[in-house]
Regions:
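Active-site-proximal loop/turn and secondary-structure-junction residues that shape catalytic pockets
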Residues: 48-52, 72-74, 102-103, 150, ...
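C-terminal amphipathic alpha-helical interaction region
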Residues: 500-700
C-alpha cells in the first residue's frame, strides 16, 4: 500500500497564528506594536489588542474554529482550558462572531478548584488568566487556543508559566551585562533554548483495560519479572513495529500542524518504550509544545488501539521513562553562549558562562533536586538506567583537564601536545564533541549545551527550567557586579575563573553514577543525597532558596511556601490513591484467585491420597503450602494497610504527615506488591486475574 504524500513545509505551522500570519494580516503599526510587546515587554493598548483579536478570530474561523479558550498551566502540572464560542447576539435574533480585546487578553477561572497551597480558599474562588503574547495561539479540535498565565485575584501566581517567564527575563538581563563586559554591543537579548527528549511506553488498549492500577495510578503496583525483559538490548534503536510506526506518522503530522519541531523518534531500551525529540526552541515555547506533545501522545495512541503511558516507572525491573532537558543560551544574533569559540576571547567568555553554571549547580544543588521530585519520579531515580539522586556535573576528560589547569595555574597540554598557559589572551582551543555520553550523570555537558537528565516523563519542564534560569541569572549577576568594578578586566577575569572552579570542583564527576562507591564519595565531598520527595521538600523552603527566587522576583516567599505545601499534599494523595487501588485489586481479585487455586490444589491432593494408589504429592503439598502462606502474609499486610488508611491524617498536614504516609502507607503498599509478585509466579495462569508483564510489554 502506498503511503500518502505529505507536503511537510506546507503543513508545518498550518494551525498556528504565528509571526508570518501576523505580518501578513495585521496593519504594519499594529504588527510593530505586537513585536515590541513580545521582545521588549511594552504593554498593548486596548485598541491595538482589539485589532489583533479581530484578525486572530477571522483566521481561526477560516480554519474551522468556532470556540476559543485561555490555555494555562496550573500547579497540577497539566494544562487547563475553558471553551467559549465566538458568538454574541447581533440584536436581531441572530448572532455574529466576535473576539474582543478583553476576551483575548483576560479571562476568569475558578482558582479555588486548582492546587494553590492555601493561596485560594473555596470562598475566594476568583482567578484570572492573561494572554502571553510571547507564545503563539493555535487551533486544535475546532478551538482557538490562547496561551495564558494564571494568577489569583490578588496577583499571586497559580501556574507554572509565570515563574518561567520571569526567570527568562532575569537571565536575559544578566547575560547581556556579561556580554557588554566582553565588548559585545550588538546583542540585545539572550534566551534559554530547550529541547526536551520525551520518553513514553505504548501498550495495547485491551491489556490496559484489564489493569486497574494502570488506569487509576498510571503504573503497575505489582508484576513479577517476565522471562524476557531488556537483557538482550534488542529493542533500543530496533526496527519500529508497523502499528507503532503508523502511530508515529500520525503524531508527526499533528505536531507539525501545531508548529512543533518533531524531529527524532526511536525505540528506547525497555520493551514497549519509545522516545520523541524536537529541535530546540526558546524555553517558553518549548514548555508549551512539550505539553501539547504529551497530550497528543495520549490522544493519537487511542486512535490506534494503544495507550501511551507517561508515568516515570510504569513497570518494575526495566527502565523507567524520563525527559532529558537540553538547555543552552542563545543570543538574538544567533550565538550559542555554551559553545566553545574559535578565539581566546570567545573561549574566555565561554569559560565564564561555564563557571557560572558550575557555581550555580553546586550552590543550589538541593533546589535542582527538588524541582524533579514527585512520587512518580521517586520510583525512577536511582533505578534502571536513571540518574542517581545526587546532583553532579559531567564535563568529560578534556574539558575537565582544562578546568584543572585553570585551578592549578599550570599549562594545559591539548591533544596536539601544544602547551598553553590558560589566560584571557591565550585561551586554548576547546574542541567540540570530545565528551563521551555519560548516561549515569544527572547533568552533562554535551559539547554546546547541558543535558539535565533527572526530569520525569510526565512532568512539565517549566519548573526545572525556572531553577536553571534563576541560578544562572544569580551567578552571572554576581560575576557582573565584580567584573564591572575591576580596574583590570583580564586579570580580574582570570582570578574569578580560577577562584570559581577551585571552590566548586566537587560538583564535577565524570565517573559511574550507578556505582555504590559514588554514594560514599559524594558524601565525602559534601554533596546532598536527597533520596525522595519527602527528603527533598524541606530544602524547597530553605532560606537560601527563598532568598534566590525573591531577589530575582521569580517567586515570592508566599508563592514558594504554597508550592511546598502543594508538593507535600500531592505526595500524600498519590500515595493514598495507590494504596486504595492495591487494596481493591487484592481483596476483590488476587486473594480470591489465590484461594481458588489453593482449593484446586487441595482437591487434587485429596484425590491423590484417596485414590487407592500410592502417588507422589510433593508438588501439591509444597505449592499449596506456599500459596497459603503467601496469601496469609498478603492478607495481614493488607489488613495493616487498611487500618493505616483509616487512621491517616489529612493530606495537607505538612512535612510530618508526608513522612507518616511514606512510612505507614507507601512502605506497606510496596510490601504488599512484593508478596503479590511471589503469588503471581505460583498461581495457575487460568486463575490469575490480571495480565502479566509479559502479556503487556509484548502486546503491540
Amino acid at each position: 500500500m502506498c503511503e500518502k504524500k505529505i507536503d511537510v513545509p506546507a503543513l508545518f505551522g498550518k494551525m498556528v497564528f504565528g509571526e508570518q500570519q501576523m505580518q501578513q494580516r495585521l496593519p504594519a503599526e499594529v504588527y510593530r506594536a505586537w513585536q515590541r510587546c513580545r521582545t521588549q515587554g511594552t504593554a498593548l493598548d486596548r485598541s491595538t489588542a482589539g485589532e489583533i483579536a479581530a484578525v486572530m478570530k477571522d483566521w481561526a474561523i477560516e480554519n474551522g474554529a468556532t470556540h476559543y479558550t485561555h490555555w494555562f498551566q496550573p500547579m497540577t502540572g497539566y494544562t487547563a482550558e475553558k471553551h467559549d464560542s465566538f458568538i454574541t447576539p447581533d440584536g436581531a435574533e441572530g448572532v455574529r462572531m466576535e473576539l474582543s480585546a478583553k476576551e483575548l487578553t483576560k479571562g476568569e477561572a475558578d482558582a479555588s478548584s486548582f492546587p494553590s497551597g492555601g493561596l485560594r480558599a473555596t470562598f475566594e474562588a476568583r482567578g484570572y488568566t492573561a494572554w502571553d503574547p510571547t507564545s503563539y495561539a493555535f487551533i486544535k479540535d475546532g478551538t482557538l487556543y490562547i496561551p495564558t498565565i494564571f494568577c489569583s485575584y490578588s496577583g499571586q501566581t497559580l501556574d507554572k508559566k509565570t515563574p518561567l517567564l520571569r526567570s527568562i527575563r532575569e537571565l536575559d538581563r544578566e547575560c547581556v551585562r556579561i556580554l557588554r563586559l566582553f565588548g559585545n554591543t550588538e546583542v540585545q537579548h539572550v534566551t534559554p533554548q530547550v529541547g526536551p527528549e520525551q520518553e513514553y511506553f505504548l501498550i495495547d488498549r485491551e491489556m490496559y483495560d484489564l489493569r486497574e492500577d494502570l488506569k487509576l495510578c498510571g503504573r503497575t503496583l505489582f508484576g513479577a519479572r517476565p522471562p524476557k525483559g531488556q537483557e538482550l538490548d534488542d529493542h533500543y534503536y530496533g526496527a519500529i513495529k508497523p502499528r507503532v510506526a503508523a502511530f508515529m506518522r500520525e503524531l508527526d503530522e499533528e505536531l507539525w500542524k501545531l508548529g512543533v519541531l518533531a524531529k527524532t523518534e526511536h525505540n528506547e531500551v525497555a520493551p514497549a518504550q519509545h522516545e520523541i525529540a524536537p529541535i530546540y526552541s526558546d524555553a517558553n515555547t518549548a514548555c508549551d509544545k512539550n505539553q501539547l506533545t504529551m497530550e497528543l501522545l495520549k490522544k493519537i495512541a487511542s486512535r490506534h488501539g494503544l495507550v501511551c503511558l507517561l508515568h516515570e516507572k510504569p513497570f518494575a525491573g526495566i527502565n523507567g521513562s524520563g525527559k532529558h532537558d537540553n538547555w543552552s543560551l542563545q543570543t538574538d544574533t544567533g550565538e550559542n553562549l555554551l559553545k566553545p569559540g574559535g578565539t581566546p576571547s570567545q573561549n574566555a567568555q565561554f569559560l565564564l558562562f561555564l563557571a557560572a553554571f558550575v557555581k550555580g549547580v553546586d550552590e543550589y544543588q538541593e533546589m535542582l533536586r527538588c524541582c524533579v521530585s514527585y512520587p512518580g519520579n521517586d520510583h525512577r531515580l536511582g533505578g534502571n538506567e536513571a540518574p542517581p539522586a545526587i546532583i553532579s556535573i559531567f564535563m568529560g576528560d578534556e574539558l575537565t583537564a582544562i578546568l584543572d589547569s585553570i585551578v592549578q595555574g599550570t599549562a594545559y597540554v591539548d591533544i596536539t601536545k601544544k602547551k598553553l598557559k590558560i589566560g584571557v589572551d591565550a585561551m586554548p582551543e576547546i574542541p567540540q564533541d570530545t565528551t563521551d555520553r555519560n548516561r549515569t550523570s544527572p547533568l552533562a555537558f554535551t559539547g554546546n549545551k547541558f543535558e539535565f537528565r533527572m526530569l520525569g516523563s510526565s512532568q512539565s519542564i517549566a519548573s526545572p527550567n525556572v531553577v536553571l534560569n534563576t541560578i544562572m541569572a544569580e551567578e552571572l549577576g554576581q560575576f557582573a557586579d565584580r567584573l564591572e568594578k575591576a580596574a583590570d578586566f583580564q586579570s580580574a577575569l582570570q582570578e574569578l575563573l580560577q577562584e570559581t572552579f577551585t571552590a566548586h570542583q566537587r560538583i564535577i564527576f565524570n565517573g559511574n553514577g550507578y556505582d555504590d562507591a559514588w554514594v560514599a564519595e559524594a558524601a565525602r565531598r559534601g554533596l546532598a543525597n536527597l533520596r525522595d520527595t519527602v527528603d527533598c521538600m524541606p530544602a524547597y523552603i530553605d532560606k537560601k532558596n527563598i532568598d534566590l527566587f525573591t531577589k530575582h522576583a521569580v517567586l515570592t516567599e508566599t508563592e514558594m511556601r504554597a508550592r511546598y505545601e502543594i508538593h507535600l499534599e500531592n505526595y500524600c494523595k498519590v500515595t493514598a490513591i495507590e494504596a486504595h487501588t492495591l487494596l481493591d485489586m487484592v481483596t476483590r481479585c488476587i486473594l480470591p484467585a489465590a484461594g481458588k487455586y489453593a482449593d484446586s490444589l487441595a482437591q487434587t491432593l485429596f484425590h491423590k491420597k484417596n485414590c487407592g494408589i500410592s502417588l507422589p504429592t510433593v508438588m501439591e503439598e509444597r505449592t499449596l503450602t506456599r500459596v497459603s502462606e503467601q496469601s496469609a502474609a498478603l492478607f495481614r499486610v493488607c489488613e495493616d494497610l487498611q487500618t493505616a488508611l483509616h487512621n491517616a491524617p489529612a493530606a495537607d498536614g505538612g512535612i510530618d504527615v508526608a513522612r507518616w504516609y511514606r512510612a505507614e502507607i507507601a512502605a506497606r503498599t510496596q510490601q504488599a506488591g512484593e508478596l503479590i509478585n511471589q503469588l503471581e509466579t505460583i498461581v495457575d495462569t487460568a486463575c490469575w486475574p490480571y495480565p502479566t508483564y509479559a502479556d503487556i510489554l509484548f502486546s503491540v
